Regions:
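Short, surface-exposed, charged amphipathic helix/loop patches that serve as local interaction elements
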Residues: 13-97
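Short acidic-hydrophobic surface loop/beta-edge motif
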Residues: 1-10
C-alpha cells in the first residue's frame, strides 16, 4: 500500500480488520473530550498512542523508517497513515470530511 506524505511516497503495510478497529477506537478517544464537551480539548496521550500504533502497523521497523525525521514530521507521517487506514478524507479547508 502506498501513501503520500512529507512530499514523498511511502510504502506501508496494509491493515487488517481487528487492528483497524483498535486504531479507530484509540483515535476516536483522542477527540472524545472535544465532542463531549463541545470544546477544542484533545486527549494528547490517546492521540500519540494512535500515531505510535499506526507507525507500528505501517512499518516492519518504524524506528528505521522514520530515521532522520523531526518529531513534527513523524507526527505528520503518522497522521497521514491514520487517515489512509481509517479512510478519512480531507475537506478543502483541511479538516476531516
Amino acid at each position: 500500500m502506498e501513501i503520500e506524505a512529507l512530499g514523498k511516497k511511502w510504502e506501508i503495510n496494509g491493515i487488517d480488520f481487528k487492528p483497524r478497529r483498535k486504531l479507530h477506537a484509540i483515535h476516536s478517544q483522542s477527540y472524545a473530550p472535544a465532542v463531549l464537551n463541545k470544546s477544542n480539548e484533545i486527549d494528547w496521550d490517546k492521540y500519540y498512542d494512535a500515531i505510535e500504533m499506526a507507525l507500528s502497523i505501517a512499518f516492519t521497523n518504524p524506528e528505521s523508517a522514520v530515521e532522520g525525521l523531526t518529531d513534527a514530521e513523524i507526527d505528520a507521517l503518522g497522521q497521514a497513515i491514520i487517515q489512509s487506514y481509517l479512510f478519512i478524507e480531507k475537506k478543502a479547508n483541511g479538516g476531516a470530511a
